[in-house]
Structures are given as structure tokens and as C-alpha cells.
Amino acid sequence: MAYRQLTLEQAAALLRCPERFLREQAIQGGLPHVRQGDNLLFSQEELLNWSSIHLLDNRKCRKKEQILSEGDQRQERILPGNYCSLEGISPQLKGKSKASILMSLTELAEKTGLLYDSSDFYESLRLREEQASTALPGGVALVHPHSRDEFLFEDSFICMAKSQYPIFFGEENGRTSDLFFVVACKDELHLPVLGCLGRLIAETTLLGDLRLAESAEEMLMTLHKAEQNPSCLLTD
């Protein structure tokens, strides 16, 4: 599938960040781009993949975000719970390895009825983890596809799961993970949802409360309760 090429101005608008920052990242920070004379062009898909890694890396290091930081002064409440269904929540996810957890998460995602091909979805999750782990401090991973190809899933959705056994999922300090979100969102929602979940993880008791939840219903109620915190109110 061909993805559109974005100018520097369009790329900065998509990520809600300064053009200067993106130019610096392209020249010095490894952001994929092509140069046409004095102009920089970006593949929309490569840009979103890079920004996902950048956003999660900043969560790991607790740095001030450089994306999703500036915009048009709108206020928009992004609620991940709106994209969750009970079918996509598991309080007892099976798996004792990263590969088996990814397979179980794919099976959970398939229960939403929104996947076109579960094997393609699994492969996209695997490729994203191969690129860089989505595991964060606190025992949680924000798993998402390497691509948001329109043929991967019909509509945006989020899955939540709590594994029966904490496993090493790639967290940089070697700690295990037992809570997993699968973020399968279209381009316009992908980064805002990742950003909101990151804020909920950092600024609320979401993770601890999810560990106490015993059913899918309780896990969904826990997420909705956490969303009452202003963390998901973007004032860009």
C-alpha cells in the first residue's frame, strides 16, 4: 500500500510539534526522510512509526514530550475506553513468552470482530516489537502494529489484558510485564491514544487498580474511572 508523502509543514501539523524539532530529528536524529533540494519530505507511515517509538521512549525516560505538544489551542478529550469492548479484555491472558503473549493478544483482538486477517495482524505486532519493545516501566506494554494498513483492521479498537504470568517483554531495565494494551487505531487516533494511555499510566493509579480487577467488566470500569482524571484532556 502506498502512503502519502508529507512536507515538513504537514508532518509537523500531524504530530503537533514544531517544524524546527522535526528538521533537527531528520538531520541529526534518524527520522526517515527524503530531500528534494532544500525541502524535506516524509512518508506518513514511516513518520507515525518513528513518532510511536519517540513517544514511548520519552515515557521510559520521563522526558518532556516533543510531539503532541503544540497545536491549535483545541481541547479534545481522547478516551481509550471508548474503543474497548468486553470481548477485547482478558483478566487471565495465557502465555509464558513474548511470542506466546503476542499470539494470545492477537487471538484477543480477533474476538473484537474487527481484524481482517489475524496472521497479518500478529506479524505486524511482531515486526513492531522487533523494531523496539513497547514495554514501559511499571510492568505494562502498549503493544501496537508496525503498520496501520487499512487491510489490517476494519476500525479502531483497543484491547486490555492481564497475564497469568509476568514475563520479560523487553523493558529496558529487565523488569517483567503483566499488563498489556493492544492499540489498533487509525492514523488520526494512533498517537493521541498512545499519549493518553502514557499519561494515565504515569499520573493515575490505573496499573495498580487493573491488577486488582478480577473480571473484564471490572477492568473496563477501572479504565473509565482513570479517564475521569484530566490526563486525557489535550489543551494543545
Locate each region found by the language model.
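Cytosolic covalent-transfer regions centered on His/Cys nucleophiles
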Residues: 1-236
